[in-house]
Amino acid sequence: MIFSGVEHMGQVPFHTVLIHGLVRDAQGRKMSKSLGNGIDPLLVIDQYGADALRFTLATGNAPGNDMRFSDEKGKASRNFANKLWNAARFVLMYLGNDYSYPGLPKDLAIEDKWILSKVNTLAKEVTDNLERFELGIAVAKLYDFIWDVFCDWYIEIAKIRLQSGEGADTAKAVLVYVLTDILKLLHPFMPFITEEIYQAIPHDTESIMISKWPEYDPTLSFADEEAQMEKIMDAIRAIRNRRAEMNIPPSKKSKVYVETAFSDVFAVGSEFMKRLAYASDVEIADAFGDLGNTVTIVTNDAKIYIPLGDLVDFEAEAKRLQKELAAAEEKLAFINKKLDNPGFVNKAPEKVVQQNRDEAAKLTEKIANLRSSLENLGK
């Protein structure tokens, strides 16, 4: 195309050309007519959307390396687009039809400073990645920020103020600011959905294509608030993980005791813990006395105690564990009986024998854990 442009037009059509690796099929094979593994982009667009196709081709794209295309990647990109769309719908629902963006207020909460600092850093890093043609790295950062940081954390935390009304105007302004920056940074990869959302939220240019590219702003760098939010988020993650391990449903709330040297930080985050860590109440102190039978969770910045009685019906849980233990012991005895039989070990395929050995090892570990849980329950 370059030679043709020079020959017929007398000028170079492109000054910068990025040469990428081959797009291979899901098995890593080169696409060819003989293999019949070619992909019709128009069919992919019909199925997942043009934005999802563009995003998929950029994801994991490293200079000099080939990439594999699969339906799973297309579905993941479509799901990502849906996640962004639903986040935008949520923001618009609270903005209403007559909302006018007032700019960022001066009185910002810790979570506002945290997300603004995060998106500020994101703008700098994505810009640097694009200038170095590191498209795959830029896309990965955008994906992680939008899905995890913005949707799963900030929006969930912002709901507290939006639903209570107190501080709602500040939350709305920050949501618009961050969403706008996200759309601009994502636009090179997903131009259609970003333009559609941009037109729906307060905007200052006719099209997102001619809007100002986000730039790093030193006044929006809040390192202290970022560190404080990480302490709170680490605690919330730890509580959620422990509850998941114990199969505690979100509907079952519990009091949380936080023993920490950072009382001021966790006092600010107590409402976040109530919403995201399913706490009925949060008590914070430098140290606690005997709290009785509790689940203990340790993070880098706090020791967290949850009364076991708030989480578990001891009698019902004991019956459940005993039933599960009996079933596991019965299954292990059956497998061990097969493995003790020379006829089975010598005649069965090695793969089948190994599967039984692996299953026996897993059951042995499970039985030990169940017995330990029963012992702890009785303490």
Indicate where each model-derived feature is located.
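Feature 926 captures the class I aminoacyl-tRNA synthetase adenylation module centered on the KMSKS loop
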Residues: 7-46, 50, 72-379
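Gly/Pro-rich active-site capping loops and adjacent beta-alpha segments
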Residues: 46, 61, 65
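Conserved pre-motif C helix in the palm subdomain of viral-like polymerases
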Residues: 1-5
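Short, solvent-exposed helix-loop connector elements
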Residues: 65-73
